[in-house]
């Protein structure tokens, strides 16, 4: 089966052009924009979106096919979510460095890390991009969360995590992406 993405298709009829950059709010982590754009049909429109420098996440799998996740309260949803470790990119920081740091800080593990993908979590209203990594050959160190982070580390068999994703109990997009990719690559589905 061929994909239509990246097959020399002409995208000109889809592209919007920025006419004016309007920054409404500049924050520590995000900026809010309301840009004027030129549509492909020649009309003008507004595009509200959140600027974010991006982040890195990491799927940690041990030799017995257990996955290390974190349970943490996510204020925008007013809910405790189960997720792979992740964090925002620091200025000019390599995404692999961010992922390794977050893995150790949040779970107390280090391991062999390899790139595992790039996702756009919510392309309808933010330019955030999230690098995904895989960590294997895990070695225990110690957890040392940031002072404003409160979380539990959870070790689960990957089959349990897959079931929880497919049953809708794990709702976090980066976690679903990483676990499902791992499951497909390792013929676990």
Enumerate the predicted regions with their spans:
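A generic structural signal for short beta-strands and their flanking turns/coil linkers
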Residues: 28-33, 54-56, 78-80, 85, ...
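Short helix-loop capping/hinge motifs at secondary-structure junctions, enriched
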Residues: 66, 139-141, 188-189
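Long hydrophobic alpha-helical segments typical of transmembrane helices together
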Residues: 167-189
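Unchanged
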Residues: 45, 54-57, 88-174
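Conserved Nudix-box catalytic region and its N-terminal flanking loop in Nudix hydrolases
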Residues: 4, 12-15, 47, 56-101
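Acidic, metal-coordinating catalytic segment for phosphate/diphosphate chemistry
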Residues: 16, 20-57, 63
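Active-site/binding-pocket entry motifs
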Residues: 38, 75, 139-140
């Amino acid at each position: 089966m061929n994909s239509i993405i990246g097959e020399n298709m002409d995208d000109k009829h889809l592209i919007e052009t920025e006419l004016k950059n309007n920054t409404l709010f500049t924050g520590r982590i995000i900026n809010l924009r309301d840009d004027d754009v030129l549509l492909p049909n020649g009309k003008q429109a507004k595009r509200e979106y959140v600027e974010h420098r991006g982040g890195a996440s990491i799927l940690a799998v041990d030799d017995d096919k257990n996955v290390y996740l974190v349970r943490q309260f996510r204020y925008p949803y007013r809910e405790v979510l189960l997720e792979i470790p992740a964090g925002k990119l620091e200025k000019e920081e390599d995404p692999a460095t961010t992922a390794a740091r977050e893995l150790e800080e949040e779970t107390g593990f280090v391991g062999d890390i390899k790139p595992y993908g790039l996702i756009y979590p919510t392309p309808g209203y933010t330019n955030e991009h999230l690098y995904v990594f895989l960590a294997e050959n895990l070695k225990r160190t110690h957890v040392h969360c940031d002072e404003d982070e409160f979380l539990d580390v959870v070790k689960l068999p990957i089959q349990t995590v897959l079931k929880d994703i497919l049953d809708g109990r794990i709702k976090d997009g980066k976690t679903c992406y990483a676990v499902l990719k791992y499951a497909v690559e390792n013929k676990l589905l």
